[in-house]
Amino acid sequence: MAESGSGAGSGSSSVGGVSNPTSLAPGDSQLIALIVEQLKSRGQFDGFRRDCLADVDTKPAYQNLRQKVDNFVSTHLDKQEWNADMNKNQLRNGLRQSVIQSGMLEAGVDRIISQVVDPKLNHIFRPQIEKAIQEYLAAQTKEEPAPPLPPGPPEPQEQEPPGPSQSVS
């Protein structure tokens, strides 16, 4: 019973409290988190990643970025005077910072995304995501008990017919 208070390790405690995801508005952060978790649990993100990685090294943007980074690293290391007392970690961290500050990674990755991910987005990824969302919401609708029917129009109450009028003649 000690586990009942620890929701941090489960990963779903922040979105698990939603009783009816179909009632959430499109774009709601809880709904998005639920859908992302569903895609992850189905392994679809891994599939997207594998699909992109299988294609990335054939694209000119990747080859160009790799060549730029190789040249940058070679130039940087050529400027260093090697000795046995050098701290390799400091050298590595300095090189990493120089590469990041150069801006070449950010620009290169943007080009890679436009060559690898963007073409797959509408034709491959979006249909799979939409299908997963529809299946998820359909399953959630089936799991939820049907909401009670709204009350119909009030039934007319039976009234006793008016008794014979007792008119005084």
Swiss-Prot record:
Record localization: Cytoplasm, Cytoskeleton, Microtubule organizing center, Centrosome; Chromosome, Centromere, Kinetochore
Bias type Gly residues, positions: 1-10
Residue stretches of biased makeup (Pro residues): 146-169
Gene Ontology CC entries for this record: centrosome; cytoplasm; kinetochore
Entry annotated with the keyword Cytoplasm: yes
Record GO biological process: cell division
Transmembrane segments: none
Family according to the record: Belongs to the BOD1 family.
Functional summary from the UniProt entry: Required for proper chromosome biorientation through the detection or correction of syntelic attachments in mitotic spindles.
Protein name: Biorientation of chromosomes in cell division protein 1
Species, as recorded: Xenopus tropicalis (Western clawed frog)
